[in-house]
Structure formats: C-alpha cells, structure tokens
Amino acid sequence: MLSFIYWAFSDTFFNWLFPFSSTGKGPWITVEGVAPKYTEPYVSAMYKSKTCLDYEVDSQMSPHKVPTYHGLSLDVKADPKTGHFQAKLPFNGGGWCKWKINQAFVSVSYTDVSHLVKDAVNEGGDGTGLTAFINNAAKTDDKETVTLNTLDYRPVIYPILEMSEGFPKRLFVRGEVGTCFFQLRLTPGAEWRIIYKPRLDETKIPKITITNGKGEWVEYPDGRIETGTQTVDFRYIK
C-alpha cells in the first residue's frame, strides 16, 4: 500500500499521466539529407529532464539525484528516386517532466549489398552518420565542431567488406569515423537545421580479414596490406 502511495505521488506517476509528446511541441529542428542508393536514413534524438530526477550511487556509495532521459526515433523514408529525406525533431517534449532535446542523431546504413558482393550480408544497425550535442549537452570531449543554428555535414563514405572466419561476409558503410560529433548551438527565433548528405563511393572497398589463429589484416584498394589490425585507415583509401 505504501509503495502504491509513493508511486501515485512520484514523478513516475505524473509522467505516466502527462507523458512525452512529439506533437505540436515546437520550435522544431528540421533534419534533411540525401541517402545514397542502397541505403536508408535514421533520425532519432535524446531528450533530457531536469524536473524528473533519478537516484544514482557514486563510488562512495552515496546516492545523488541525476537527470532522466527519453529517446525518440522517427519513421523516416527517403524518396526512392532521389534519396531525399526530411523530418522534424521537436525542441520540447513537454509532459510533466518538461523534456528538452539534448542530442540528435542522423545516419545511413545499407539495405542491400548484393550489387557489390552477392554472398555478403549488410550490417544493419545505425550505419554511419553524426551526433549533435544540443546547446549545453554534455560532450564526449572538446573535439566537437561547433556550429550555430545550422549543421551541414557532407562526408565521403565507403563500403567496408569484413571477412571473418566462420561467419558470413559482411558489408557496411563508414566514413573516416563511424560517427562525427558536433556541438549545435541554437539561437531562439532562428531557423534550426541539420543537413546530412553523404556521398557513397563504391569504387573503393577496403577488405578486413579475420582468421582463427592465423592473424588479421586490412587490404586496401591499391593493394596495400596492413597486418595485425581490423581498423581501416581512411588515409589509404583516397
């Protein structure tokens, strides 16, 4: 009974009554781009609440309050002819917890790789793309590119073929980094945009080979071979 009373008057209960909503909670961040042929886009975001808090125990076993988070994934479809896609992420998620956007994610991944290697499978998952830390969101380090109101990212990406002994051949797309990080600062009243237009170059396919006990190596399109590694060095692709 006491646990029910506690729940009924907690943030969890009121968040259940007045949940996150992505409808009509402008202003909006417009996300647009072009997904290369044989790929599909993904757009999602993480929202943070400083109203609804949770407890966390530190290394000294002392409890302290921390913010809570809510994830939002959008159903985004690219135009089958042009690859163009567009979506809108709400800045506010509303609700009892007063959600505000903290991070935005945009990426592309393969849907079909049979045109490159017939017996390979596509990786699926999040593919390659960008993460935008919004305003004062906690960053991974100090190396993020800082942009104001509009983030425009147009990398060259490549297919990577992974041949691991005992597993099917695997093809996935990558840029120089799996995810590029940005700090996106938003000015009230301005137009907010995230643009992601990768160019897929399928003329160059690095190959990763992983064996059981016979080593591992990466072979580059020009014939160069780097042994003892599974990491592709993009300096050798261009």
Question: Positions of the model-derived regions?
Answer:
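Residue-level recognition of well-ordered beta-strand positions that form the cores
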Residues: 32-34, 46
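Residues at beta-strand starts and edge strands
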Residues: 25-29, 39-41, 83, 102, ...
